[in-house]
Amino acid sequence: MSEPGERVDTFEAPVAPESLDLVQDRLAAFWAHDETVSAADRMRLEMAVVEIVANIVEHAFTVDAGGRALTVALSMTHERVEAVLSDNGLPAEIDLGAVTMPDEDATSGRGLALAVAAVDEVVYDRVEGRNRWRLVCRRTVD
């Protein structure tokens, strides 16, 4: 249910590396509807969204899985910008409270830590056989 003055954009994206470009393009179009969203808030939410989508592409499905589905819902109000990412992949076995940045020599494992650090709230849950990631960035004033 939308709040008064809330802008919402929902779209489907392939669960494939090229979905990152699609998501970034849709975010750019979404930002164009309200130029009062600060550059910092745009960057924070976009970084978190891209990192979570990359993790979905890499980890949520077995290599030969068919029927992959990713839904992205973007919303903004005067107080916040938010993304909800939903996929039908394997459950994520993750404790968000334990996420930390890996050692500097690590070659992977930074994406989720970057997402958690970038936004004000990251929530993961599994609802009706789907993974759901909710990313919230409270808006700041430039």
Label every PLM stretch briefly:
Residues 66-74:
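A conserved short beta-strand within the histidine kinase catalytic ATPase domain
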Residues 79-108:
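Glycine-rich/acidic phosphate-handling loop/turn and adjacent ATP-lid/helix
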Residues 40-64:
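Conserved ATP-binding N-box helix of the HATPase_c
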Residues 104-119:
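Glycine-rich phosphate-binding loop
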Residues 1-15, 116-142:
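Flexible, glycine-/charge-rich segments associated with ATP-binding catalytic modules
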Residues 1-43, 47:
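Bergerat-fold GHKL ATPase/HATPase_c domain
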